[in-house]
Amino acid sequence: MPLVVHKYGGTSVGDAERIRNVARRIIAAKDAGDDVVVVVSAMGDTTDDLIKLAYQVTDTPSARELDVLLSTGELVASTLLAMALKGMGHEAISLSGAQAGIRTDSNHSKARIMAIDPARVKSELGAGRIVIVAGFQGIAQDSDVTTLGRGGSDTTAVALAVSLGARACERYTDVEGIYTADPRQVPEACKLKEISYDEMLELATYGSKVMHPRAVELGQIYGMPILVASSFNDNRGTLIHGGHMEIRNKVTAITADTDVAKITIVGVPDRPGIAAGIFGSLAKAGVSVDTIVQNASIQGITDLSFTVSKGDAGKALGVVEPLAQEIGARECVADTSLSKVSIIGTGMQNTPGYAATMFDTLFAGGINIQLITTSEIRITVIIAGEQAAEAVKALHKAFELEKE
């Protein structure tokens, strides 16, 4: 039988009635002729609640024990869903990440999937069961439970779909698909029928919370189509794939990310090796750096700015401040009140005018640009955090995305 992997987010399984609703959707897919493997997230705000509880017990929870704790959220959801399916007369079984054969590295809270042994899942499918897999987790070589980081259930689902040779991975959530902008910010935003892996990866990396970037990367590498749709209705969703789509000479979507902090090292001596030392030390500390800008040198002195997530700002300062003193820089300054706004679209390649329209629109709205970064299909600006929603609305109108 053809196989499909469903993934349901925390909102979709947020209470008993929603779990029963998901069970009915799974049964419909099974009745339509598909074998079904399901990946679930933890119910509602369970993960956040467990993190808060851990920090109430101790200010420094063990990374290993925190992973074990957080993995229980998905176990609860998967077992309840299996119970609901059995209550509706269908054979089903819940599996932890370890039982489903998901092997990871040992990097607690940010583990990466190294391999999947699908033998147990295939065996259960062969016995006619619907298989429910707890997302977001796996097991390391030392047999410790690991978690994949926030949004990791998406990665679990796509990785399982690839390893099982599924025809598609379908991600069901509380939105109907991928939009030209966040519809909560821009009511005129339009749902896209399809989007390329490249565009979706940029969207996911630069602010869209609908798909996790690592899941999109996996889909792109292995050519696994991913459908994003609502678990609350049967409306058509958005297909993420690598097919030959019509090249539109326009922006596809606009996204914003308010989880941005900028670190500036003022008065850096302009000599070889300093940037390597700074960013090498940040990498060793586990700090992920995004935009990097170095000013032109004046009399052998320059300023170096880079962005990190707000949660990493303190750690980044702790790394660079001693280095700044060591190299004779004047000071380190942090700004945690910023946001990234991006325009994204494959139609932007080799076509002039997009940057000019973007910058003119922001200027007309009195929005100051602090930093700029680009790729072949993206232009991103760093602006004041409180102006992000205003910038997205203005750019959505400027590029006429309401006509999509």
Predicted features, each with a name:
Residues 219:
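Acidic-aromatic/histidine active-site loop/patch
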Residues 237-404:
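A conserved regulatory-domain signal marking ACT and ACT-like small-molecule sensing domains
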